Amino acid sequence: MRNLKLHRTLEFRDIQAPGKPQCFCLRAEQGTVLIGSERGLTEVDPVRREVKTEISLVAEGFLPEDGSGCIVGIQDLLDQESVCVATASGDVIVCNLSTQQLECVGSVASGISVMSWSPDQELLLLATAQQTLIMMTKDFEVIAEEQIHQDDFGEGKFVTVGWGSKQTQFHGSEGRPTAFPVQLPENALPWDDRRPHITWRGDGQYFAVSVVCRQTEARKIRVWNREFALQSTSESVPGLGPALAWKPSGSLIASTQDKPNQQDVVFFEKNGLLHGHFTLPFLKDEVKVNDLLWNADSSVLAIWLEDLPKEDSSTLKSYVQLWTVGNYHWYLKQSLPFSTTGKNQIVSLLWDPVTPCRLHVLCTGWRYLCCDWHWTTDRSSGNSANDLANVAVIDGNRVLVTVFRQTVVPPPMCTYRLLIPHPVNQVIFSAHLGNDLAVLDASNQISVYKCGDKPNMDSTVKLGAVGGNGFKVPLTTPHLEKRYSIQFGNNEEEEEEEVNALQLSFLTWVEDDTFLAISYSHSSSQSIIHHLTVTHSEVDEEQGQLDVSSSVTVDGVVIGLCCCSKTKSLAVQLADGQVLKYLWESPSLAVEPWKNSEGIPVRFVHPCTQMEVATIGGEECVLGLTDRCRFFINDTEVASNITSFAVCDDFLLVTTHSHTCQVFSLSGASLKMLQAALSGSHEASGEILRKVERGSRIVTVVPQDTKLILQMPRGNLEVVHHRALVLAQIRKWLDKLMFKEAFECMRKLRINLNLIHDHNPKVFLENVETFVKQIDSVNHINLFFTELREEDVTKTMYPPPITKSVQVSTHPDGKKLDLICDAMRAAMEAINPRKFCLSILTSHVKKTTPELEIVLQKVQELQGNLPFDPESVSVEEALKYLLLLVDVNELFNHSLGTYDFNLVLMVAEKSQKDPKEYLPFLNTLKKMETNYQRFTIDKYLKRYEKALGHLSKCGPEYFTECLNLIKDKNLYKEALKLYRPDSPQYQAVSMAYGEHLMQEHLYEPAGLVFARCGAQEKALEAFLACGSWQQALCVAAQLQMSKDKVAGLARTLAGKLVEQRKHSEAATVLEQYAQDYEEAVLLLLEGSAWEEALRLVYKYDRVDIIETSVKPSILEAQKNYMDFLDSETATFIRHKNRLQVVRALRRQAPQVHVDHEVAHGPESDLFSETSSIMSGSEMSGRYSHSNSRISARSSKNRRKAERKKHSLKEGSPLEGLALLEALSEVVQSVEKLKDEVRAILKVLFLFEFEEQAKELQRAFESTLQLMERAVPEIWTPAGQQSSTTPVLGPSSTANSITASYQQQKTCVPALDAGVYMPPKMDPRSQWKLSLLE
């Protein structure tokens, strides 16, 4: 749905050269045009508007002096820096334009009709006046000569046995002669020049020749290959014209055919068979086709037509029409009228070989015209909700308009079409009223159509599709307000209009009665911006006039003009890339440079064919896209792979070469953020990016809606709802409390309904009643309930593109479901509890702890509803609905838990349960005593606490059963609450509880339980087992044990305490209860409690122990500390040095283990969006129970593997991590010795072991200093990020770069995260003894 829009026009008028122009060619590298006349060659530079070279062919005798000579072909030879010229007299001349030397490289005595070079300029083909073809090499050596008329069909002649042909078919009463009709050939057309026409395929492997057959006098097309072998001959086509053009892509050969009532452009295949056609918009014998030309990329077919003389026609015209094809329909996109007499008569036209949409035209009055077009989509501005998202497509004198807000129909169909008297060249939409449009036709008239409330249909507006017959049209179509002619006010402009068929370009509708347009000066590189203002007249209501109210001259060629519909800013782009701001609303009509935020004038590095003005982060910027897919924002190139873009509702939408569509919010964006996102340096989120079909382009975006219309290369349309547009629109609706619109959109597009609450929980909970009233559907509210989950989808599934400045309060207790269910239930009960009965039941079921008992009670209450109440729900309906939400067995069990057998029977009857299964069970229960009955029910339902409560009320005769239940289900704590402490049942339960704790090796709680119930012997046994010496000695005192038994008990307790490395407590027990202070001193020395040992020595006056035990123990401890420090220091230095080596190797070889890391990296992003339909809650619910055992086993294996993978073996994959762990352990072990070292330093100094004390203090200080200096080197920020920093550079590979980015995405495991943090060392710890310094 694209049109051709005039990009720029370059005109060189009144070229000063001799003779009359006959043909021309382009010199692409030099940027000049070489024109041939009956006098010679003239090279002109159209940009500088000067004649560069004149070469006379008359002086050398190649052309006659009387002016009767003719040049039939000119070709620029790129590799020879020369030009090849062929004359009608038969000479082939090579001319060096630098030296102006002429050389005749060959001559044909009979004369030359056509000269045609192959596209690769390796072969030259000449058609002679004797109806022969001569093929030559680029060095002008003759390869072969063949007759142009051939009797043979060619090498591609069809072989058939006749089955299915007309000759083998039954022809009824007409007889067999009808199988062989005699087809009389038609003569060539009267206006046929009868000359051969040659065209080459784009790759130069084949060429086609159209000639008039001598025998039949009708035209035929023959196809030859590069070896000059005839391949095929076309089928007989009556009325075949002389024009011939082979599509460069190689698929079709275009020609023309006169039919009885029309004139067609027909297409032939290489085998000579017809393959498609389209009809020209002219009557029979109205025009003739002089030439057909395909552009370089085969996207546009140019047709040069000329009016045939008629008796009643005084002025004849010629036309250049540009046709394109899409969805198998041919569109006339541009029509350029020229005259057939005077200076404006066309001599020849050529497509540019480099720029596909550039057309060169040469006229007889030495006037040269060069026009550049570019592809554009003419769509409405989309600045309001009333904009219908109109897109206009030009098709000759029709404008096909599609209203995408209401209908999506594929081209060439449309919503409605506008009928214009002349072919249309440009369509524009109003900048302030997007549904109004204006049409500029080939006669430079502007037809203005406006959307209003007129009831009468306009005759120039026709509905598409069924045409409205028998249907009510909900669409308001526009009506023709007036057709305006443009009045420039002087004859000079009118004369220029005769020469330049495209006088006006970039027509822009800025106000209701004001248009802007661009024209170009034919004498200098200047452009003129015209203000076209409506002249009000009461004479003619249908025909109006536009006057040029003012004009502004701009130095430079304008190649772009766009107006922002919101800010009314108008940007002008010049050919050199400079962007200007045109202050068209200012009284002075000034033009000033467009400046960025830094005050620097904006200049595009490359000319942009599409330009828009948008506000990005509060700054008005110019966006541009080149024909080479380079995308600019102001003067910054932000991407080089953009195929199309659009700006709508503060969003920027782009499609890329990687077949994605990305959407960015411009309100809070910045230029750097957009550049980073579009360059691919940051991974795009799921909301921004969407995969699209290959080659998709943006057609339009429906304003304030979610629809994005894309067009595929073959022409069909696709409507997508981009996630970013959808979420943005939903957020707007939720902010406006338009819950119904948001809900319908989310339901249709499968957006998780949790977003309704999570977008703003506080606002939603305050407006729950509004939500219920707007939805007003039990089914939809139930759907909302079923999708609720505790997850905050604004943090997981749909994070906002811009972080909110005000954080919305969440639910810290994680009871989101309960809050919503309670609020919704209260609102529904207040509005209409009978209507929303099923939804109220759902609110109870969906709570974190389903309230099934309450649900069943509410169902039971429904029995009182009136049967004729239309809004009420019956018990049967409610139960059937509940069975959809809850498992039937679970519902049956909960109904049984209410102890109401009527409710149980009601649930069972609605389920699929067999009465033989539940009736005997229920009958048995009914016969039991109430408490025992409820105990049986609770036990059946595994509600053992309730069952115990009911059983305890059954009496002492059931205590044995009760005690067994307590033991089986470990209900000791609950049972102790049910009996009085002085009861025998309490004692029995306590004894059983204590025995249970002893079996579980929980000795201290068991001792407390035994002590509480008076079982002192068992309590002493328990306290003794756990080493609780205070409690054990207390119990011993209560048992009134003798001193000897207490001493023995004390020794036993001391042994237990020593095993637990509690030497000080063991010494206290021996000293106070066994009176064995010598053994107590030895235990204190063993536990390094030096000062406490000395206290006991002096307390009991046993100074001799100092020499025998204390001093040797102190010296031995000092020696052990020295050995430990030496070992730890050596280990620390070894690991530190190895870590440096490992890090150096990693920097040198970043690709180590890359393949393993990539293979186990994050999952690939190659799945389609529709593959994630099943929600996470559904999958977790399906597999959580069955896989619990597997999960436990796999987690155990993972922990085991986690321990094994951190190996200190050199070369292991995670050696660096293992070294960090080992170094951290060494530092922590040394740090823990500070208090112990200070204690031993004091006693060493006390007993005059000063040298040993100084040695230990120096060694410990040296070790600590070594570690303090090394910690910043080992645990550096760069070292922490080295594993996640992308590895780039000349030594990197594809795998290494991929792995580094995969590591960026992967979080550090929780087990490894602490390794990257340096161990804590307290420099303020006072461990040193100042007396030793």
From Swiss-Prot:
Q: What is its main location?
A: cytoplasm
> What would be one Gene Ontology cellular-component term for the protein?
cytosol
UniProt xrefs under InterPro entries: A-sol_ELP1, Elp1, ELP1_b-prop_2, ELP1_N_b-prop_1, HB_ELP1, TPR_ELP1
Among Pfam families, the record links this protein to:
A-sol_ELP1 (PF23925), Beta-prop_ELP1_1st (PF04762), Beta-prop_ELP1_2nd (PF23797), HB_ELP1 (PF23936), TPR_ELP1 (PF23878)
Name a single GO biological process.
tRNA wobble uridine modification
**Transmembrane stretches, start-end:** none
Phosphoserine modification sites?
A: S805, S1172, S1175
Tissue specificity annotation: In the testis, expression is restricted to germ cells during spermatogenesis with no expression detected in somatic cells such as Sertoli cells or Leydig cells (at protein level). In the ovary, expressed in oocytes of primary, secondary and antral follicles (at protein level). Widely expressed in adult tissues with highest levels in brain and also expressed at all embryonic stages.
Report the PTM annotation.
Answer: Phosphorylated.
The protein's role, per its UniProt record: Component of the elongator complex which is required for multiple tRNA modifications, including mcm5U (5-methoxycarbonylmethyl uridine), mcm5s2U (5-methoxycarbonylmethyl-2-thiouridine), and ncm5U (5-carbamoylmethyl uridine). The elongator complex catalyzes the formation of carboxymethyluridine in the wobble base at position 34 in tRNAs. Regulates the migration and branching of projection neurons in the developing cerebral cortex, through a process depending on alpha-tubulin acetylation. ELP1 binds to tRNA, mediating interaction of the elongator complex with tRNA.
Q: Which family does it belong to?
A: Belongs to the ELP1/IKA1 family.
Name this protein carries in UniProt = Elongator complex protein 1
**What organism does the record attribute this protein to?**
Mus musculus
Identify the taxonomic lineage of the organism of origin.
Eukaryota, Metazoa, Chordata, Craniata, Vertebrata
Gene responsible for this protein: Elp1
